[in-house]
A protein has these predicted regions:
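Assembly/oligomerization interface modules of large self-assembling protein complexes
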Residues: 5-6, 18-96, 117, 140-147
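Sec-exported extracytoplasmic/periplasmic mature domains
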Residues: 121-129, 133
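Second-shell loop/turn segments in exported
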Residues: 103-110
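Sequence/fold signature of self-assembling virion shell proteins
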Residues: 2-39, 55, 143-189, 193-197, ...
Length: 358
C-alpha cells in the first residue's frame, strides 16, 4: 500500500482533502499577577469638579492644654491649622480601528470585535496598574499623570535609616542592601491605622520563602552566618510552601513591582523613581486601604468620567470612520490615587535581591 494510505498518489494529495482544526480564541502568555487596580478599593468620583481636595491634621491641641492654679488668669488659645491636599483625575485611553474587510471577508468562528475589545480592556487595566505605582507628576514633571505610590511616599522627604533615625519612617532606604526585617517591623509599627497588605515583587517573595524554609537569616553573632531558620512548625505537606504572611499581614506578590534603578526617587532627590536601566534595586510597600471619598483615612483609586455607576471606563464605538473602510472603538478612563492620611502608606526602597537579614 502506498504511503498515502491507498488510492492517492502521495500523502500530500490526501492531505489536500483535509482541513486543520484551529481552537477559537487566544491563550494568554503575557500574564501579570495581582494588579493593584484589582486590590485597591475603588470609588467613583463623579461630579467632583476640577480637583479632589481633602484636609490632613497639621497641628493638634495637646500643647494648648495648660495647667493652672485656682485664681490664675486663663489664656485663650488659637493655634490649629491643617494641610490641604489635592488630586486631579488624569485621562488615559486606548482606541483601535476595526477594518470591515477583516470582519466581512475573514469572518470565522472568532469574533474579531470581541477579541479586540478584550485585549483593549486588558491593556488599559494593566497600564492603570503600572501607573498606580510609578506615575509621577510631582517629581517626574509629567502633567498628564497623577502621583503613584512611589511619588506619594517620596513626599515624606529624606528617608529613614538606622543611622538617620529621626527621618520619617514611612519612607525607608535599604541603601543597596538586603531587606532587613527590623526595617519592615519598624515601619509597620509606625503605621498607626494598621496595614492591609505588604506589596512585594516576586524576587522578595522568594527570599521570604527561603528565609523561613531552608536558608535562615543572617546574624552577626552566628558563626556560620545563619541561624534560626525554619522557626515555624509545619506538617510534611506544608514543606516548601510560600510564606503568605508577616506579622499577620498578607504578603502580596505583584508583578507590577518591577526592577528599579537604584538611588532614584528617594525623597532626598528631585527625580522620580525610575525603572531599571543599569543598577538593579527593588521596593516594597505597606498599604492601608480605605475609601477616602467616604472619609476613610486609607488609600483609594478614584475614577470618574463614566455614565454608569461602577464603570471603570467608558466605551465609545463608531460604525464607520471617515477615510477608512472601518469602524472604531475607544476606551476612556479618568483616575487618580488618593492617600487620605500619610500614615496609610509606607515604602522601603533600594533593596537588593539577597537573603533577608534580621
Amino acid at each position: 500500500m502506498a504511503s498515502s494510505g491507498g488510492h492517492w498518489k502521495t500523502l500530500a494529495e490526501a492531505q489536500k482533502l483535509t482541513q486543520s482544526t484551529k481552537i477559537p480564541g487566544v491563550f494568554e502568555e503575557d500574564i501579570k499577577r495581582n494588579n493593584p487596580l484589582e486590590r485597591f478599593p475603588v470609588a467613583q468620583a463623579a461630579g467632583t469638579g476640577l480637583k479632589i481636595e481633602w484636609l490632613r491634621e497639621s497641628t493638634g491641641t495637646e500643647d494648648a492644654v495648660t495647667e493652672a492654679d485656682v485664681g490664675d488668669q486663663l489664656v485663650w488659645g488659637e493655634d490649629v491649622d491643617y494641610t490641604e491636599v489635592e488630586s486631579t483625575l488624569r485621562y488615559m485611553y486606548i482606541q483601535r480601528k476595526l477594518d470591515r474587510y477583516v470582519q466581512n471577508i475573514y469572518g470565522t468562528y472568532n469574533d474579531y470585535k470581541a477579541q479586540v475589545l478584550l485585549e483593549m480592556e486588558k491593556g488599559l487595566k494593566r497600564k492603570i496598574g503600572d501607573r498606580i505605582i510609578y506615575a509621577d507628576t510631582t517629581y517626574g514633571g509629567t502633567p498628564t499623570q497623577f502621583d503613584g505610590l512611589h511619588a506619594l511616599a517620596a513626599e515624606r522627604g529624606a528617608p529613614w535609616t538606622t543611622s538617620s533615625n529621626t527621618n520619617n519612617k514611612q519612607n525607608m532606604d535599604m541603601a543597596s542592601g538586603a531587606l532587613s526585617l527590623l526595617y519592615l517591623r519598624t515601619q509597620i509599627d509606625n503605621m498607626r491605622y494598621g496595614v492591609s497588605e505588604i506589596l512585594i515583587p516576586a524576587q522578595l517573595g522568594i527570599r521570604f520563602d527561603a528565609a523561613y524554609q531552608e536558608r535562615g537569616f543572617t546574624y552577626s553573632v552566628s558563626s556560620n552566618e545563619t541561624n534560626h531558620f525554619m522557626m515555624l512548625t509545619q506538617s510534611v505537606n506544608e514543606l516548601g510552601r510560600p510564606i503568605l504572611f508577616f506579622m499577620g499581614i498578607p504578603l502580596v506578590r505583584t508583578d507590577y513591582l518591577v526592577r528599579e534603578e537604584d538611588g532614584t526617587g528617594t525623597g532626598s532627590t528631585s527625580n522620580k523613581r525610575a525603572k531599571y536601566s543599569s543598577t538593579e534595586a527593588f521596593s516594597l510597600f505597606c498599604v492601608k486601604y480605605g475609601n477616602v471619598l467616604a472619609r476613610e483615612p486609607g488609600i483609594t483609586y478614584a475614577y470618574g468620567g463614566t455614565e454608569g455607576e461602577g464603570d471603570l471606563y467608558e466605551l465609545w464605538t463608531w460604525e464607520r470612520l471617515e477615510d477608512y473602510n472601518a469602524g472604531g472603538m475607544r476606551m476612556d478612563s479618568y483616575g487618580s490615587v488618593l492617600l487620605g492620611s500619610t500614615l496609610c502608606l509606607g515604602r522601603i526602597f533600594d533593596i537588593t535581591d539577597e537573603a533577608l537579614v534580621a
